[in-house]
Design a protein with these regions (language model features):
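Polybasic, low-complexity intrinsically disordered tails and interdomain linkers
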Residues: 1-37, 95-113
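A short linear-motif detector with a strong N-terminal bias
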Residues: 1-2, 20-21, 47, 66-71
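Short charge-dense sequence patches
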Residues: 3-11, 50-59
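Residue-level signature of catalytic and energy-coupling elements of molecular machines
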Residues: 25, 41, 60
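Extracellular/luminal Protease-associated
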Residues: 33, 38-52, 57, 65-69
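Short basic, glycine-rich beta-strand/loop surfaces that mediate nucleic-acid
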Residues: 53-54, 58-112
Length: 113
């Protein structure tokens, strides 16, 4: 994923953290995806072992939830308001970030083609 797009993903997480609702951690994110209670999922690429998140892309695709990867769990944790790294974040309510989410979803879909 291009750096410019990664920055937009972090920005969306920050906006949702401040004006909407985000949930953090792979277990919490998995539950929300299974229930269809999230609009966007972000996963860190530097998670060890990678099997921790291996199921999430499939679940997201089954439920038609947009997802993206970012390189750093530390930066993802920071963007979501934590002082610790986090493997995954679910945006439950984007708050004022709706236009950014729509733009990101379009760009991510283009990348997958």
């Amino acid at each position: 994923m291009p750096k410019e797009l990664q920055d937009k993903v972090y920005e969306l997480v920050e906006i949702a953290r401040d004006t909407g609702k985000v949930k953090k951690g792979s277990n919490e994110v998995t539950k929300l995806v299974e229930r269809g209670e999230t609009v966007f999922v972000v996963m860190a690429e530097d998670v060890q072992p990678p099997e921790i998140l291996a199921h999430l892309p499939l679940l997201c695709e089954e439920r038609n939830i947009t997802y993206a990867y970012v390189p750093s769990k530390a930066e993802l944790g920071n963007a979501s308001g934590l002082e610790k790294p986090t493997a995954a974040v679910a945006v439950v309510d984007v708050g004022k970030g709706k236009p950014l989410l729509e733009n990101l979803s379009e760009q991510i879909k283009k990348l997958k083609k």
